[in-house]
């Protein structure tokens, strides 16, 4: 069998010798579900020629805006833009943010061609302001293109996708930064052991998670990245989150209990990804990625929107040139020891709690709203101090020195919308926890068991109405601070899986169904805890307890301090 016919940009000696043009020569399937399965299984991965054909077809079928540059545009402009300069000395566009062009298996001519294509893309897409993933995409596509012009056209179609349901590549700092925050949120929910390690070894976990796209678009070897890209072209952006989460899981598995190779975990992960072949095959990496039962694309999009909104509100929409690359994550702020004092938790314990909260609120500083030692043991005073703040953090210390609490996504003023009756409200971002005698967090049961529900459209769920006790705000959900995991987006088997928080004159309740995660009386004197369906938790402390102290904390924008 003849070796595959590589183009003039590829160093055939670097290409995987196992990839011969064996097996199928054409792809005849047209059904999306079948195409997904074939992509995940690597149907065209062992044929260089077939992969090139599949890329051509999949990219041709991307819905694009009306005016999308094609190969003829490249032929017209490349001479004017490049001039007589040597392609190897051409500068990279500013929007790649000093990202190095991965060479993969390109020869010197191929490396220069990538630079030419990137400059021509910059000429045709002046609206792209931040796109560090693009060099890797262009470099990969060049392996499977007839010439530079065809590669240019493919990249332009990916950038010009106008299907609102199929996000492909971040093209602004706001989109990139919010994606990093979203990835951090997903790690917090789906890779808790790895997240705990990151918190322990890094001063700034968001800085570590902000490197996630580089793991895929730059550090992964070509045969791994191409397999990811195969599925990405069929399924979209969510695949990238899946694979990055799988990488982090494998990193934790290999490194757990071992000393890190350096004091820079960010660099350690990069090296791990670069040498990932020592740990796991491309097939096993994808198998792990698709074994993670993520929420729907719609729910992830809601979270992304919430993170973008938080960044916009703080005026963070472009990268600040005055910030050095090593300090790029100026948006992430830790709990400052000098400004923090609690009667219940230490600075370290508060930082641990902060590592659990959604990334868009980790940008804030803790603000003491209520302290039973300052404001008295009164539930009505507790509500008064907390109203107008969303989210809040509830901390309880018992007379036995046990410490537990809850992160509560919704303003306590929502309790007044039930006509004096006790009604549940909140979203699936709520969670309960204990800190003493040992640390344990319990999230919404649907996060660990998504099979309990299927995401449904907001329109259909509103049309059908709801029989649950969850409050429905009249304001536009897009304007709410916590749209992510709102119960109205899910078909729940019973209302007990969504009893997040409730408050009346005589008591405060967190979690419901089969029991209550936390119940506190109106005098903030006595409480009880037990298993509940909403969080599937164990008792957070002694089942019946006396309260020594209660605190409620809000989230303050550092710019308003």
From Swiss-Prot:
Coarse class of the protein's main subcellular location: membrane
InterPro entries assigned: Rab-GAP-TBC_dom, Rab-GAP_TBC_sf, TLDc_dom
Residues modified as Phosphoserine: 475, 482
Family matches, as SMART domains: TBC, TLDc
Membrane-topology annotation of the record: Peripheral membrane protein
One Pfam family linked to the record: RabGAP-TBC
Domain TLDc: residue ranges: 343-556
Record-level GO BP terms: axon development; cellular response to oxidative stress; dendrite development; negative regulation of cellular response to oxidative stress; neuron projection development; positive regulation of dendrite morphogenesis; positive regulation of excitatory postsynaptic potential; positive regulation of neuron migration
Single GO MF descriptor: GTPase activator activity
Rab-GAP TBC domain sequence ranges: 45-236
Lineage top rank: taxon: Eukaryota
Binding site for a 1,2-diacyl-sn-glycero-3-phospho-(1D-myo-inositol): 36, 40, 238, 242, 293-297
Alphabetized UniProt keyword annotations: Cell membrane, Cell projection, Cytoplasm, Cytoplasmic vesicle, GTPase activation, Membrane, Phosphoprotein, Synapse
Compartmental location: Cell membrane; Cytoplasm; Cytoplasmic vesicle membrane; Presynapse
Tissue expression summary: Expressed in brain, particularly at the level of the cortex and the hippocampus. Expressed in the inner ear in spiral ganglion cells, a collection of neurons critical for hearing and balance.
Cellular component GO terms, alphabetical: cytoplasmic vesicle membrane; neuromuscular junction; plasma membrane; terminal bouton
Annotated SUPFAM superfamilies: Ypt/Rab-GAP domain of gyp1p (SSF47923)
Quaternary data: Interacts with ARF6.
Recorded domain comment: The Rab-GAP TBC domain is essential for phosphatidylinositol binding.
Function summary: May act as a GTPase-activating protein for Rab family protein(s). Involved in neuronal projections development, probably through a negative modulation of ARF6 function. Involved in the regulation of synaptic vesicle trafficking.
Designated name of the protein: TBC1 domain family member 24
């Amino acid at each position: 069998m003849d070796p595959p016919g590589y183009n003039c940009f590829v160093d055939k000696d670097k290409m995987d010798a196992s990839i011969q043009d064996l097996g199928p020569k054409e792809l005849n399937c047209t059904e999306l579900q079948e195409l997904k399965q074939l992509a995940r299984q690597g149907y065209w991965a062992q044929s260089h020629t077939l992969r090139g054909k599949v890329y051509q077809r999949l990219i041709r079928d991307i819905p694009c805006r009306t005016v999308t540059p094609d190969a003829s545009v490249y032929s017209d402009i490349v001479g004017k833009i490049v001039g007589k300069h040597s392609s190897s000395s051409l500068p990279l566009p500013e929007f790649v943010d000093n990202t190095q062009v991965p060479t993969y298996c390109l020869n010197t001519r191929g490396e220069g061609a990538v630079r030419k294509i990137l400059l021509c893309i910059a000429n045709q897409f002046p609206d792209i302001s931040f796109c560090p993933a693009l060099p890797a995409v262009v470099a990969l596509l060049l392996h499977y293109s007839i010439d530079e012009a065809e590669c240019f056209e493919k990249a332009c179609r990916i950038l010009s996708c106008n299907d609102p349901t199929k996000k492909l590549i971040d093209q602004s700092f706001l989109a990139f930064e919010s994606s990093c925050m979203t990835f951090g949120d997903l790690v917090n929910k789906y890779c808790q052991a790895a997240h705990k390690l990151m918190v322990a070894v890094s001063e700034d976990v968001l800085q570590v998670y902000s490197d996630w796209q580089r793991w895929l678009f730059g550090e992964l070897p070509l045969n791994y990245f191409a397999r990811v890209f195969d599925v990405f072209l069929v399924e979209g952006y969510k695949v990238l989150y899946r694979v990055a989460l799988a990488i982090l899981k494998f990193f934790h598995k290999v490194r757990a209990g071992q000393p890190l190779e350096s004091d820079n975990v960010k660099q350690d992960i990069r090296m791990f990804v670069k040498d990932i072949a020592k740990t796991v095959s491309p097939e096993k990496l994808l198998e792990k990625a698709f074994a993670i039962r993520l929420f729907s694309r719609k729910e992830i999009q809601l979270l992304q929107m919430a993170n973008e909104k938080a960044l916009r509100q703080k005026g963070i929409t472009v990268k600040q040139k005055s910030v050095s690359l090593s300090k790029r994550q100026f948006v992430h702020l830790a709990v400052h020891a000098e400004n923090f004092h609690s009667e219940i938790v230490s600075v370290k314990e508060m930082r641990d709690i902060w590592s659990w909260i959604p990334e868009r609120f980790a940008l804030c500083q803790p603000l003491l709203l209520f302290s039973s030692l300052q404001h008295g043991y009164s539930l009505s005073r507790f509500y008064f101090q907390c109203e107008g703040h969303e989210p809040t953090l509830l901390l309880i210390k018992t007379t036995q020195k046990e410490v537990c609490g809850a992160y509560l996504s919704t303003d306590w003023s929502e309790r007044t919308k039930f006509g004096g009756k006790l009604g549940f409200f909140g979203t699936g971002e709520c969670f309960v926890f204990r800190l003493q005698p040992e640390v344990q967090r319990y999230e919404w049961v649907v996060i660990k068991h998504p099979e309990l529900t299927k995401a449904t459209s907001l329109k259909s769920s509103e049309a059908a109405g709801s029989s649950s006790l969850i409050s429905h705000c009249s304001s536009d959900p897009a304007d709410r601070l916590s749209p992510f995991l709102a119960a109205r987006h899910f078909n729940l088997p019973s209302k007990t899986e969504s009893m997040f928080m409730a408050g009346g004159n005589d008591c405060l309740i967190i979690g419901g169904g089969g029991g209550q995660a936390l119940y506190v009386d109106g005098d903030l004197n006595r409480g009880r805890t037990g298993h509940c369906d909403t969080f599937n938790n164990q008792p957070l402390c002694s089942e019946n307890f006396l309260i020594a102290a209660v605190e409620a904390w809000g989230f303050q924008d550092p710019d308003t301090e």
